[in-house]
């Protein structure tokens, strides 16, 4: 068992937990549970599914915030009838009164890799949090069957603990993807660059005469030949893929020191 995350220097920290799948999704409660020991945790998330909304904000629209029943003792929960970005803004400004230290978003059902991450409301929430000066990290995984996996929870705790470190600058931005978990478990954690790929946008005609738009990742080469060190290639090897990005221009940061601390902490948990 991995113990001893919280220290007296960070116990007072406020942690905002959000997602793009709605406040009732199991993934957000697995995430809240994983970080609950690290500080004062509050869930602020959309009322319903907001997948694919990216950094979208509800301008010129009244957005309601309602406190709802929490699924965890000691954790308050608020439902927002808006986007994940709205949830971060209203959570930090209205609920926390500009006193949020860290924002964690997820756990998203499905990878957020390559260019797909910029469509994701899960990662979009983290981008907005970073832009507002908060440290932020998005978490995603392929199959939600393992959302409550003990190792997954401890890796999230370890990464978030480093996110909260005074050594991690304000506005830092990270994206974390968990691999498909095999019988042998997770093979480790590694830094990764967003893979080079194209987006494949599909449009289906619906019975009511309207159209449904959905996306899928179109990888330019097959999984065995992916560029070494890309997020998709790291995941294909059964490892957790951690990506650091510059919150001001979203450039990939290969040598980010906080990223390397997170990788080391995750690998200590995984063993």
Regions found by a protein language model. Give the residues of each.
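A cross-family phosphate/adenosyl-ligand binding-site feature
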Residues: 15, 26-99
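Electrostatically charged, flexible surface regions
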Residues: 153-271
